[in-house]
Amino acid sequence: MRHHNANRKFGRSKNQRHALLKGLAASLIQHGRILTTEAKAKELRPNVEKMVTRAKNPTLASRRLLLSGFYNNESVVTKLISDIAPRYAERAGGYTRIIKLAARKGDASPMAVIEFVQ
């Protein structure tokens, strides 16, 4: 039975899932919006929301924690702390939106765009 199993597994191991979500989060922060499957967007959203909330208080500890979540990619963390987090200083959450799109042609997978709210 699947009771109390909240997260999607995407047919991948734990390490592969974490790598996928780290990569998607870094792409979203770099580009502002990404096209992905609906399930991946829904799984990515809470992770990114927590990262933005963490970046709103830019201490050394929070910077290091964010760096560990992005493969030590300094440019992504700098953009998150200096560009994205100040936009949402007055907002208490809900930094992203998911827009559902038509199914992908090859395998009919439901697609979605996840982007930062302006």
Which residues are covered by each model-predicted region?
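Structured, basic alpha/beta domains of bacterial-type, RNA-associated proteins
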Residues: 1-12, 16-19, 23-118
